[in-house]
Amino acid sequence: MADLTTEPISEATQKGSWVSGLGSLLSYAFVLGLLGLLGWGLIKVNSGQRDSGMAPDFTLTSFDGETVTLSELRGQVVIINFWASWCPPCRDEAPYLESTWRKYKDKGVFFIGVDYADTEKEALAYIDEFDITYFNGPDVGTIISQEYRMDGVPETYFVAKNGELRGTKIGPLFPPELDQRIEELLAEPYAGE
């Protein structure tokens, strides 16, 4: 009987082991590639702005301690604006948002400002600088912005009286865009009226 520990391994056996190992490695790489593509596809399905379907419900606490829950605003047109004090385009649209709010606040329209990734001190200074009177609060933990799949600030969501999203605006709003959107939403019939 031959001693297996001292017998040399044949060249064919070495080549066969190498080919077998390479085949296994390629199989693993293929499976990992497929899993990666599947995961990427799932991420892409769940990303991008929300601009239709029911608006994700949330409760926001304002800087002065008041709360608002989106689903409790049924029957009103709701404008949700994500902003930050450090955002130059947010500063560009702030006067228009406030003047539009004042124009429509008694006509069945509710504005919600969601402050994104900001300090309270800076956010309050921004609100004071632009004399903003509509409801505003911080997105603590960025929970609301994640739910809305927000890309950046400013970003505005238009919610119909029945709670459905009717579109998204990425970037600053300028006259007469917001007025037009609000008028369209106010004209929509609502079963609760």
Model-derived features: where do they sit?
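A short beta-strand-turn-helix
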Residues: 57-78, 101
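Thiol/disulfide oxidoreductase modules built on the thioredoxin-like
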Residues: 125-133, 138-190
